[in-house]
């Protein structure tokens, strides 16, 4: 990623590209955001509704647990009714993997080592190949193989990486290369070290995450430290923020991490002050309201909400639209970094929403025009 501010540049690790349904993973593809449903998969209606909420939040890929035959039986309806590729989460039962592939799963999350015999692994790979499924090798510090625990004494980076490479070799021995790898741990130090080590010894796309990260607040902090560290170093091709919360919350946090590092852009990025006695309006309440009112906008743009003139004008220089608290019940509105007009306090929120929606519409039109112009330039001459 290039920038005229070199301190903002992140050079991503070069990796092979695979596909999870229509979503490319690895190579120069955008870093995709994932989540996992926490409904009973057999309750297809509830699972579909949850996935649709995650879609509205911006999810790219959704994982669904398939612990039994009834779950894989429900998978076909789920796949049919949603707009994002579905990863079937499989453990131990190789037949569930085959059934999930037949039901339309775009990817199978397995550990080849716990599927069973070489013949069973061969059957799973055959089903994946026939149905266009990729595979995710999911190594976890909490379920490492016995021989690795005996060798290393405890889950450590070497053990996680060795497990991942052993499983990768199983797939490669079957001439199957459409796979990605994860080496997750709940300990941030362990997870980051394992991913860094794995990134140095292979070019497979990496699914990054801090597993069992915790509650919404604690898990967000933990994941931001771990995933932010990896992404800043260029490691990671797809990601999931694991929270004990609704799946759409995981998606929103994932997007915020990517937006903070300039790796992807979606929706309105609000820059706001923590507020103090100098604030000309209630900053905290205003930001909360605007986040809700502007959640439907997907066009990337920036909005600064600053309570006073100490930092307000400076922040507005770097945003598409800005508001700075003033006196006498009126506040200054900035457009493209310049003072533009004032707005009465009692109509400020409605006014900002209107400005942002209009700006988003202009940006969408400009993007569409640029795309049409580029396509016309590539079209053969008549």
UniProtKB/Swiss-Prot annotation:
Question: What is this enzyme's catalytic activity, as reactions?
Answer: (2E)-4-hydroxy-3-methylbut-2-enyl diphosphate + oxidized [flavodoxin] + H2O + 2 H(+) = 2-C-methyl-D-erythritol 2,4-cyclic diphosphate + reduced [flavodoxin]
Name the pathway it acts in.
Isoprenoid biosynthesis; isopentenyl diphosphate biosynthesis via DXP pathway; isopentenyl diphosphate from 1-deoxy-D-xylulose 5-phosphate: step 5/6
Report the SUPFAM superfamilies cross-referenced here.
Inosine monophosphate dehydrogenase (IMPDH) (SSF51412), Nitrite and sulphite reductase 4Fe-4S domain-like (SSF56014)
Pfam families recorded for this chain?
GcpE
EC number(s) per UniProt? Answer: 1.17.7.3
Q: Which InterPro entries match?
A: Dihydropteroate_synth-like_sf (IPR011005), IspG_bac (IPR016425), IspG_bac-typ (IPR004588), NO2/SO3_Rdtase_4Fe4S_sf (IPR045854)
Q: What class of enzyme is it?
A: oxidoreductase
Q: Which residues bind [4Fe-4S] cluster?
A: 273, 276, 308, 315
Q: Which UniProt keywords apply?
A: 4Fe-4S, Iron, Iron-sulfur, Isoprene biosynthesis, Metal-binding, Oxidoreductase
Q: Which cofactors does it use?
A: [4Fe-4S] cluster
A single GO BP:
isopentenyl diphosphate biosynthetic process, methylerythritol 4-phosphate pathway
Q: Does the keyword 4Fe-4S apply?
A: yes
Any GO molecular function: 4-hydroxy-3-methylbut-2-enyl-diphosphate synthase activity (flavodoxin)
Query: Would the keyword 4Fe-4S turn up in this protein's UniProt record?
Result: yes
Q: How is the cofactor bound?
A: Binds 1 [4Fe-4S] cluster.
Q: What does this protein do?
A: Converts 2C-methyl-D-erythritol 2,4-cyclodiphosphate (ME-2,4cPP) into 1-hydroxy-2-methyl-2-(E)-butenyl 4-diphosphate.
Please report which protein family the annotation says this sequence is part of.
Belongs to the IspG family.
Name used for this protein in its record: 4-hydroxy-3-methylbut-2-en-1-yl diphosphate synthase (flavodoxin)
What organism is the protein native to?
A: Gluconacetobacter diazotrophicus (strain ATCC 49037 / DSM 5601 / CCUG 37298 / CIP 103539 / LMG 7603 / PAl5)
Taxonomic path: Bacteria, Pseudomonadati, Pseudomonadota, Alphaproteobacteria, Acetobacterales
